[in-house]
Structure formats: C-alpha cells, structure tokens
C-alpha cells in the first residue's frame, strides 16, 4: 500500500517544532499540548503553515468561542466534552486556510468554487438609461 501507518495514537506534550505539531497528519493521531493563557494557545495554533481543522476544549463556553474565533483554520470545533466534533451540517462549507487552503466543499462556499465573480461599475448613467439587454 505504501506510506506510513500508525495505530490510533495520542501524543502528549508534543514539542513545538515536532512534525506532528507543525504539519498535517492524516490518520488516527491526536497531538496534545496545554497552554497557560488564551494568547499563548492562539499564537501556537496560528504558528503553523497549515490550517485545515482545530479543536478548542474548554469548560467555559465564552472562552471557547473567543479562542475559536481567533484561530485561523477552515474548521474549528469548540467543545466542552468532545461530543459532536465531526457532526457537521452539509450547508457548512469545508476547507482549510494557508497551505491547507485548496478550495471549499459543500455549502455556499463550495458552490462559489464553481462560479466566477465579476463586478461592473457604471458611472454617469443608470442601468435603465443603458437599456440593458440579455446577452446570453
């Protein structure tokens, strides 16, 4: 099959420069670090070039939402008990930031992947004056 395989693993107190902390790991691996302040947690979360998904666990809902809003990732899960971490509504777009930011899937963001946005600015006359006609 190729590639590396690792059994489901939880890595505790991962060093900041470790590959499992700085790069995306696709597989059953959870890298865990603790932080003393919100600022430290946000700085660490945003220090990587990747931003596919992050999780904030806290017993304080206001703190969890405050931190989640500051993390640069395509999906941030805020939870107090780990429930619902993968429960997403299909109307919610999925995609990452930074080096993980290759497009979006699902939701309005996914729809926009298949459209071209164009702005036309008219000055000095109204659209009624221009007698707009359908061109397609």
Describe each region flagged by the PLM.
Residues 5-136:
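Conserved C-terminal structural/oligomerization subdomain of aldehyde/semialdehyde dehydrogenase
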């Amino acid at each position: 099959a190729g590639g590396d395989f690792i059994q489901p693993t939880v890595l505790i107190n991962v060093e900041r420069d470790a590959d499992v902390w700085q790069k995306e790991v696709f597989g059953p691996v959870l890298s865990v670090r603790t932080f003393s302040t919100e600022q430290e947690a946000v700085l660490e979360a945003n220090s990587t070039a990747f931003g596919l998904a992050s999780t904030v666990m806290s017993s304080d809902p206001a703190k969890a939402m405050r931190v989640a809003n500051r993390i640069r990732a395509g999906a941030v899960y805020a939870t107090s008990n780990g429930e619902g971490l993968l429960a997403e509504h299909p109307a919610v777009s999925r995609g990452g930031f930074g080096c993980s930011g290759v497009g979006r899937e699902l939701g309005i963001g996914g729809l926009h992947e298949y459209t071209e946005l164009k702005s036309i600015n008219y000055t000095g006359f109204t659209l009624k004056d221009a007698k707009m006609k359908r061109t397609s």
